[in-house]
């Protein structure tokens, strides 16, 4: 099966939307305080937040059985910098981003996923509207309906 994964993030929250056919599932979460992760998840930039959203979006999608083993996931990037990091699989100077890439690669390997990265115009990012306040009520803040 094929999916499109849209994601966005800022210093307070991150969101992701998984589109499978005509069905779109939207989720949004607040970043936990940094002390809960021993300082490892001290989000300092929107780019870091987007990498968290990408990692959590894939992990969550697998956990609620929307994304399954051997599925193809079209990762919809609205940041050229992030897109370049992902397609080149290059190290950055940001440990949080490098850790997220490592965890994403682990998920891909363990579940035999095929990721295909796409660079898109930010106005086409359907996950962005949940952070902007325009459509906050359409994204779920929990997984109760999926488990």
Report the location of each language-model feature:
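RNase H catalytic domain
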Residues: 55-133
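Extended, charge-rich low-complexity interaction segments
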Residues: 141-147
């Amino acid at each position: 099966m094929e999916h499109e994964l849209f994601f966005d993030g800022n210093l307070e929250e991150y969101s992701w939307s998984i589109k499978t056919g005509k069905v779109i599932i939207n989720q949004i979460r607040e970043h936990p305080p940094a002390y809960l992760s021993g300082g490892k998840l001290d989000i300092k930039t929107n780019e870091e937040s987007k990498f968290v959203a990408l990692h959590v979006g894939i992990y969550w999608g697998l956990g609620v059985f929307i994304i399954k083993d051997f599925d193809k996931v079209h990762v919809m990037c609205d940041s050229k910098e992030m897109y370049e990091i992902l397609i080149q699989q290059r190290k950055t100077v940001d440990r949080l981003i490098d850790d997220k890439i490592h965890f994403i690669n682990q998920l891909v390997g363990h579940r035999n996923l095929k990721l295909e990265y796409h660079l898109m115009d930010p106005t086409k990012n359907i996950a962005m509207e949940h952070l902007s306040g325009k459509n906050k009520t359409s994204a779920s803040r929990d997984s109760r309906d999926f488990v």
